[in-house]
Amino acid sequence: MSIERITYDNFQNDPFINELDINDETKGAYEILKWAYQTYENDIVYSCSFGAESMVLIDLISQIKPDAQIVFLDTDLHFQETYDLIDRVKDKYPQLRIKMKKPELTLEEQGEKYNPALWKNDPNQCCYIRKIKPLEDVLSGAVAWISGLRRAQSPTRAHTNFINKDERFKSIKVCPLIYWTEEEVWSYIRDKDLPYNELHDQNYPSIGCIPCTSPVFDSNDSRAGRWSNSSKTECGLHVADKP
């Protein structure tokens, strides 16, 4: 099917949601990515967390656009294992253009201006400074961005479509993996022998910044372990979307 270039201003609905064959090996993900890069070319960015879903998307993207632009929001609070994984990904996919996007404030400057442990006292403000504002800067020159959201991850993501109007960033958010289960993600990683964050083998289902990520021993929730001492469930990158 032929789909026009969808933008924030002309978005009406997801044209793929009832049309795309989701029974193929990638549950529609490959076709969505192929359409996205053909349509947006250099006007699309993959904001990559380097979690398990990221490994699937990176592998698929490399088959479509080997020199795709990938942005990692480097908060300066990530685990060393995450940085080690990025190095392994660079070795495996040398053509990918991986950009480490840092916040305007260093941790020291943030501590002086707000609080030395802002992630504890005001995690929403910390996420805004170190993740949301940097992504706003990245997307200021892009029409669309790619995310690894899956519907099964959490109730807040259950209505995610392939193509979404992103109200927070005033852009189009492309989510190729919405129909994938966690088991399918890991089967793909194992079958393709892809690199992944070693913390996943140490009971970390979801990996973010060190102060806000904990190992989990008694939950099947793929988002468990994030902000475990508060009611917070999202960093803020995905909370303003409309189904």
Curated annotation (Swiss-Prot):
Positions annotated to bind [4Fe-4S] cluster: C126, C127, C209, C212
Give the UniProt record's GO annotations in the biological process aspect.
cysteine biosynthetic process; hydrogen sulfide biosynthetic process; sulfate assimilation, phosphoadenylyl sulfate reduction by phosphoadenylyl-sulfate reductase (thioredoxin)
Q: Which domain of life is it from?
A: Bacteria
Report the family membership: Belongs to the PAPS reductase family. CysH subfamily.
**UniProt EC number:** 1.8.4.10
The keyword Ribosomal protein is annotated on this UniProt entry: no
The record's remark on the cofactor is: Binds 1 [4Fe-4S] cluster per subunit.
Q: What is this protein called?
A: Adenosine 5'-phosphosulfate reductase
Q: What class of enzyme is it?
A: oxidoreductase
Query: Its pathway?
Result: Sulfur metabolism; hydrogen sulfide biosynthesis; sulfite from sulfate
Active site feature: C235
The record's subcellular location field reads: Cytoplasm
Q: Which UniProt keywords apply?
A: Cytoplasm, Iron, Iron-sulfur, Metal-binding, Oxidoreductase
**Cellular component GO terms, alphabetical:** cytoplasm
Q: Name one GO molecular function term.
A: adenylyl-sulfate reductase (thioredoxin) activity
Catalyses: [thioredoxin]-disulfide + sulfite + AMP + 2 H(+) = adenosine 5'-phosphosulfate + [thioredoxin]-dithiol
Does the keyword Metal-binding belong to this entry? yes
Q: What is the recorded function of this protein according to its Swiss-Prot or TrEMBL entry?
A: Catalyzes the formation of sulfite from adenosine 5'-phosphosulfate (APS) using thioredoxin as an electron donor.
Q: Which cofactors does the annotated protein need, by name?
A: [4Fe-4S] cluster
